[in-house]
Amino acid sequence: MTERRDALRAYIDEHGAASTGELCALFPDRSPMTIRRDLGYLARIGAITRTHGGARAFRRGEGQHESFYYERENENTALKRRMAALAIPFVEARRSLFIDSGSTTMIFAQLLPDKDLTILTSAPNIALHIATQKPTCSVLLTGGAVNRNTLSCSGYGSAEILQSLNIDIAFMGASGFSEAGGFTAGEHAECILKRLVLGKAERVILLMDSSKIGRNMPYTFARAPEIHILITDTGLPASIEERLQEKGVQVIKAER
């Protein structure tokens, strides 16, 4: 299997792009479904980019910027809801939580029970939802500059509020993960904020779907041993799951 996937990747890299039919012809003893699964795996680890009817080579620098929040909020919403639901049982009444910015964490905030919680968030949309929909919860916004792409606040003022607040559980997001780079973000200021949160939180739960595997963004904010629980989906490669578990990460998977 590994040799076949390596051969597929090499062919796509050499030719720049290839159709599924063209790739199937390279392995006449394998079904088109098998080849499509191989392409899906290669796309998940960032080796190629899927296209309609085939795949193309991964371009240098591709995926190195944050996508717009409004582009992500309606993508894979059912999967994000299943992942967010798996995080809810970890929430206990009268606890202090940090909720990171992101489309999955927004769904988590929507599902959050009204349990007299103290919630700090870097996301203005999450703060607004908590303030208007969870009457027994207190909400604090980190402050700082608002990034229009990610709907996240960071920078000046955010460190001060973090220094004064103890966090029981941080529910984090990540823009990418690779074994070499760890968990990564696309903005330096947001990376600094995430690092501060990790230093204050008793427990860190990270929600990240398997499409982020192999996507290496510019700024590392966490290594595997700093994450207690990863909530992801069944698309996570078994080899990566095993290595995360070896480093002490509990992996919980939603059906993809």
Describe the function of each predicted region:
Residues 75-83, 100, 122, 154, ...:
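Short secondary-structure boundary/capping elements
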Residues 80-88, 105, 159, 191:
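Short, well-ordered alpha-helical scaffold segments within catalytic/effector domains
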Residues 64, 100-130, 138-140:
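Alpha-helical recognition/docking segments in bacterial nutrient-uptake
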Residues 4-6, 10, 18-22, 30, ...:
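Conserved phosphate- and dinucleotide-binding cores of soluble alpha/beta proteins
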Residues 2-6, 14-22, 26-29, 33-34, ...:
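HTH-adjacent hinge/linker in prokaryotic transcriptional regulators
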Residues 86, 90, 107, 111, ...:
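Rossmann-fold NAD(P)-dependent oxidoreductase module
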Residues 93-97, 114-119, 226-229:
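Short active-site oxyanion
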